[in-house]
Amino acid sequence: MINFTTNTYTLKREILNFSNKISRKLSKPNRKFTADMTYGMLASGSCLLTDVVDQLHEDSKKVNSVERLTRHLNKGIPNAALSSYLHTIRKWVPNEPVIHIDDSDIIKPDGRKFEALGLVRDGSKSTDTKNVYEKGYHVTEACVMTKSNHPVSIYSKIHSSKEKTFTSVNNVTFDAMERGKAMFGK
């Protein structure tokens, strides 16, 4: 019979080792946040903070743990963590990398109170002859293929034309291309 507890702890150790690699230059609270989010999302199979907190099994109240994670998320990704993450990924990629860049959309047709909710072309409903616009957000994602042909994200941004700092979708796409160029010098 397989010992599932041993497998669980082995998997948790591997997740925490990866988390420590990408957060070693961060402060202790940021390292804890990185470990908690990485483990919580993988263990729960969800990105909902309440589901993540359920997997952490902390002694504090659930609402307090969700607030702690929310505060860290609002700060954004520290540059040191991003740099470590991209450096780690670089080791997994072949000499001639394949980078996929995808400009997509997230549609929220019933959304009323979402922050910076703008109009986007609904790729699911639009055709060559007809464009359908819905409330939602633009999504730009860049992934690189590893040596074992697994896609790994190197750039991900959700953006809206209603944001004050928004310039154009093309600028965000070019940022994703620049990230790939800077990582691999191609």
Task: Report each predicted region and the residues it spans.
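Short, positively charged, Gly/Tyr-enriched micro-motifs
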Residues: 3, 25-80
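Electropositive, glycine- and tryptophan-enriched low-complexity nucleic-acid-binding patches
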Residues: 123-185
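Residues that form generic nucleotide/phosphate-binding pockets
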Residues: 14, 18-21, 40, 55, ...
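Active-site-proximal, Lys/Arg-enriched surface segment
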Residues: 66-147
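Basic, short loop/linker segments at the boundary and entry of helix-turn-helix/winged-helix-like folds
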Residues: 11-33
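Long, contiguous hydrophobic alpha-helical segments, chiefly transmembrane helices and signal peptides
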Residues: 34, 38-41, 49-52, 69-72, ...
